[in-house]
């Protein structure tokens, strides 16, 4: 199901057909360094992750992470979405893109669309985001989206790693 489209992108729900793409994305060096190993090491693992995480989130929350495809040819380039994350008071916006599609404005474009969708369709007025402390690029994108660094936090399920918490306090620039 298509969620929305922007000038260059189409966001749709993750499905089994996206397993190969997901397997590639979650095993890229930047994903492993800044997000962590999600134990997705085969097509079967990717299929299970899509079903047990993404599809389950759509059913339980009414939102989740979505595949970001190029409008011109349907090629998946990344993901963007919303998460009701344990340990955060507000809904979390997140994104990740294949290395060859970074620094092309797709993160910004998909996230602006996601913020608009969250507000207009879901009634979510404020979002937050978390990043690895060393993930400078994501921090800059979040600031461009109208979020600002608030503090370092630890999520309940992760007792060793700290995250930067960004809080929405404005509109995208």
Identify the role of each PLM range.
Residues 26, 35, 57-59:
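Hydrophobic residues in alpha-helical segments
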Residues 1-33, 67-173:
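Acyl-donor (CoA/ACP) binding surface of acyl/acetyltransferases
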Residues 53-55, 152-153:
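Short, P/G- and charge-enriched loop/turn segments at secondary-structure junctions
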Residues 32-52:
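Conserved GNAT-fold acetyl-CoA-binding loop/helix
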Residues 51-54, 115:
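Short, well-ordered amphipathic alpha-helices
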Residues 54-67:
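A short helix-loop-beta-strand connector motif used in the catalytic cores of GNAT acetyltransferases and
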């Amino acid at each position: 199901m298509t969620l929305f489209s922007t000038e260059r992108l189409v966001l749709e729900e993750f499905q089994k057909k996206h397993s190969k793409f997901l397997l590639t994305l979650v095993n890229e060096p930047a994903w492993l360094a800044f997000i962590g190993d999600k134990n997705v090491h085969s097509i079967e693992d990717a299929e299970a992750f899509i079903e047990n995480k993404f599809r389950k989130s759509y059913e339980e929350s009414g939102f989740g992470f979505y595949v970001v495809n190029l409008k011109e040819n349907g090629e998946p380039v990344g993901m963007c979405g919303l998460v009701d994350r344990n340990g955060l008071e507000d809904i979390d916006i997140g994104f990740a893109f294949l290395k060859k599609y970074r620094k092309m404005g797709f993160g910004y474009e998909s996230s602006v669309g996601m913020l608009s969708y969250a507000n207009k369709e879901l009634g979510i007025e404020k979002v937050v985001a978390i990043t690895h402390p060393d993930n400078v690029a994501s921090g800059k994108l979040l600031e461009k989206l109208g979020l600002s660094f608030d503090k370092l936090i630890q999520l309940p399920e992760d007792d060793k790693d700290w995250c930067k918490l960004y809080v929405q306090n404005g509109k995208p620039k």
